Amino acid sequence: MLLIKCRRLKRGYLLMKDGMGFGWLNTGHRKKLVFMIVSVLLVSIFECVRLGIIMTAKSEYYMQKADELHQRERKIKAKRGRILDRNGIVLAANEVVCTVSVIHSQIEDEEKVIKVLAGELDIDVEEVTKKVKKVSSMEYIKTNVAKEIGDEIRKYNLAGVKVDEDYKRVYPYDELASKVLGFTGADNQGILGLEAKYDTYLAGTNGQILTLSDAGGIEIKGSCENRVLPVDGQDLYTTLDVNIQKYATQLAWETMVKKEAKQVSIIVMRPDNGEILAMANVPEYNLNSPYELNYEPDEEDAQKDKMDLLNNMWRNFCINDTYEPGSIFKTVTATAALETGVVGLNDSFTCSGATVVSDRRIRCHKTTGHGTQDFTHTVYNSCNPAFVEWGRRVGTDNMYLYMGKLGLLAKTGIDLSGEAGTIIHKQENVGAVELATMSFGQSFQITPVQMLRAVSAIVNGGRLVTPHFGLYTSSSDGSVVNEFAYSTQDEAISSQTSETMKKILEGVVSEGGGTKAYIDGYSIGGKTATSQKLPRGSGKYISSFIGFATADNPQVIAMCLIDEPKGVYYGGTIAAPVVKTLYENILPYIGIERAVQLEKNDD
């Protein structure tokens, strides 16, 4: 209505005249009209301001969103670094494989794509059809495809089908050192062992390919393509020696079969610096198929979750599990007694076959008793009642002090994940009985590698080293990138006590309980142990022996543990001979020559 003239003639109305004549306009309508006009103006102003903000302050954000709509990104996988032994022998490598994927919007002949991929990849047609017809930016059909098959698929030149090169982790020795090396997952990321611990160095950095697509999602042929090249991972050189690892594994298998044991572990280490030359845990598992059980499950296992069974199969007994060390721990009690001066080499103890502490009767393994013996022979004889007395003299405070000095109250810091810690009474809760049983290696639990580390410190002059596998990483041209350093605590014990203990432990092998580790022409030191497994009275044992060579200048130390052997279970009888056989084969290999035969064996 064209407003010409208006008069207020009635309450709430205006008389308005236009070209058609006069008419009445409700003033309430007028207010609504004004409100609508003002609202439209305000909304328009707001939108203009918002558009201005978008065009200025947020322009980069929306440009990025637009780019994302038209750019398609594909990864170029980095080659994972290899794992090698100390001599450059490859333990973990890579095999070129392919990843086959489809881009739905680019497919021109769905039926042909489905037929070719199902046939070449040996996949069910329905599964391929579902993925090909799925509307998504990219759909993976299959990974870890053999390169030869990937090359065949490329020859079809199928629109919308991408065949990208990838890498698959392979382990040339299958089961060798499986519980040390670990393995990688589908994305080539380390899951267990050294693969996981050194993943940052091994993984490298993936590259990428960026291509442009039109509004329909079709890749524009000949469009600008940006490539960011991958950075390959670094090679990891380890302390392992393949030849020693092979022999230790073979020996462990033979022992497990012979003794019908649950498992057998052998560790070989340099006591002067903590470099681990071998760590065998049998049964091992196949690194190239780590999700397949290494045994046929019995009825009881069949009821368990498979992941629980796999996790148990992957466990490294040497570091993931604890046990009561038994008589090998007597080396610690003896060391503490000498260091504190509460016992001298000429001190004697008379063993009658048992001793009583509070209300507890503690027996000696020789039920008729050892009679009177000096300190040195209490170690040779591994006499429990004698060590109860030496432990009493040392006292709780000093026992814990020297356990700490020898690394038994803390984790070793070994470069493998999942290391277990010590299980022990709080110091203030240790009474006479607890101290007595601790003195000969019961009532607390440690890992095998903790025990090996402690004995190494006792015989290497008193230096507490860090057991480890990693030496250094190198680039593809062989140049060293990262050299790993490990802590060493000097003077954990005095060099004088260390010298004394070396001589005593040499006597254990030459004339004490460890004679089955004796090798003519070599000076070997060591200590045996037979540990009862909990609960007491179960009839289950862990038999073990730690031996070092040579006794006067230890260059190598080895530990053998036999878990739940059948029949004879004494450590000196079944574990010591394993270390003897090991040393007969590896000592010449590492350059430790046999001395002139001892006179007592000349005839």
Per-range role (PLM):
Residues L2-P297, T322, D397-G407, A517-Y518, ...:
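Periplasmic/cell-envelope proteins involved in peptidoglycan metabolism and beta-lactam response
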Residues L2-Y13, A92, D214-E219, S223-E225, ...:
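Beta-lactam-recognizing serine transpeptidase/beta-lactamase-like catalytic domain environment
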